[in-house]
């Protein structure tokens, strides 16, 4: 436990030395991604589907798109490759920035961005294929290591994963996939920095080096990554609980100032969340760089810089605080408008499975007749196909809970 506390203390201190630069780095990247890159990609996909007369794209109509619109599928594959390339540039830029900040080496943002783009272009073909597989198959299941709004666009949706867990027959394969992804994400944790800082190695030798670097250290690395994630999450949860209870006190004892204090609480929470986001990304990537042997900060230089408290450092801290305040202020304005009802639009009323406040059995005509009196805008029903290609209105895939029959709907006939 002492080692873990020392490990946490060292990481928090390392982040604290340069917190302003890290916050500027992470918040700026996220602003660019969420404001420009992701909307641009979303618009491109939507436009592609509209032009080709495709209303939506899910696993249910994937085969149809594959056979009837092969060019659309090719375009989507190219889009996925583009996203993987952008994720690589993002990570290369972050790795290079963290290394530069820790080692206090001079380099402009533009230089590092160009180097990150060059890192992608100089990847060997086989290394690039492995990198794509790493992003698509390993990182989505090991998001404790790295999260990106870009990767969220090419991962399996959460509702599909949840639906898979409802089928006990495939629990084994799911657990196996998660276990393998976790093992590979730790054993190949140095894969990305090796591709960035050690381009001379062949793909085979690079993988061997990654495997050797983490040999005998799997549990140690897993515990370190887990401890960092838990510690940061705990800080976030405690801060939310603190402000939640403060707001409850304000609502009960200071009702005239409750709205103003709610905006202030949300403002502070947004600043905390942005700092914790930067902390989680930087600490994990810093750990990876150290494990790969590409991060050797000079303690002497750090101490000199801390003593000098140069104008440049103070300017960066000011810029970081200004950016945090602007982001938090934008969120606070939105929260104010929301809490005051300025953004209220009449929401669409949707009856879930045709019922209203438990007024009948889900997906049944009697319940629908009662629900219709409330005049909802939409009614959501669950329709499934039987073995003899008939349709039944039913939610559960399996009849065991309703009828005591451990069979799925598509295994039985309507008769």
Walk through the language-model features, giving the residues of each.
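Hydrophobic alpha-helical membrane segments
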Residues: 1-347
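Phosphate-group recognition and catalysis centered on beta-loop-alpha active-site segments
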Residues: 297-415
């Amino acid at each position: 436990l002492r080692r873990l506390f020392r490990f946490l203390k060292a990481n928090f201190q390392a982040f604290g030395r340069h917190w302003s630069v890290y916050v500027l780095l992470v918040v700026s990247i996220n602003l660019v991604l969420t404001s420009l890159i992701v909307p641009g990609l979303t618009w491109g996909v939507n436009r592609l589907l509209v032009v080709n007369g495709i209303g939506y794209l899910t696993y249910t109509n994937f085969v149809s798109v594959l056979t009837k619109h092969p060019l659309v599928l090719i375009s989507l594959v190219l889009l996925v490759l583009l996203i993987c390339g952008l994720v690589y540039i993002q990570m290369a830029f972050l790795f290079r920035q963290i290394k530069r900040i820790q080692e206090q080496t001079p380099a402009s943002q533009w230089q590092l961005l160009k180097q990150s783009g060059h890192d992608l272009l100089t990847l060997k073909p086989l290394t690039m294929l492995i990198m794509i597989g790493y992003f698509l198959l390993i990182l989505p299941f090991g998001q404790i290591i790295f999260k990106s709004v870009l990767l969220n666009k090419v991962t399996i949706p959460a509702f599909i994963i949840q639906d898979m867990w409802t089928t006990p027959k495939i629990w084994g394969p799911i657990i196996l996939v998660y276990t393998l992804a976790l093992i590979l994400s730790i054993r190949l944790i140095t894969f990305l920095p090796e591709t960035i800082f050690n381009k001379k190695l062949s793909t085979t030798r690079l993988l061997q080096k990654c495997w050797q670097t983490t040999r005998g250290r799997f549990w140690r690395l897993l515990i370190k990554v887990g401890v960092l994630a838990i510690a940061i999450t705990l800080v976030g949860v405690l801060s939310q609980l603190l402000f939640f209870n403060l707001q409850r006190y304000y609502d009960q004892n200071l009702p005239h100032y409750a709205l103003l204090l709610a905006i202030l609480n949300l403002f502070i929470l947004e600043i905390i969340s942005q700092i914790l986001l930067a902390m989680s990304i930087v600490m994990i990537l810093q750990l990876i760089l150290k494990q790969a042997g590409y991060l050797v900060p000079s303690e002497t230089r750090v101490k000199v810089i801390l003593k000098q408290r140069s104008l440049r450092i103070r300017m960066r801290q000011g810029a970081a605080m200004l950016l945090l305040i602007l982001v938090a202020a934008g969120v606070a304005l939105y929260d104010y408008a929301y809490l005051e009802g300025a953004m209220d639009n009449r929401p669409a009323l949707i009856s879930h499975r045709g019922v209203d406040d438990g007024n009948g059995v889900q997906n049944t005509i009697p319940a629908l007749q009662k629900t219709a009196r409330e005049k909802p805008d939409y009614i959501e029903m669950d329709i499934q196909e039987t073995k003899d290609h008939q349709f039944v209105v039913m939610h559960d895939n399996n009849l065991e809970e309703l009828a005591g029959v451990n069979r799925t709907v598509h295994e039985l006939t309507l008769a």
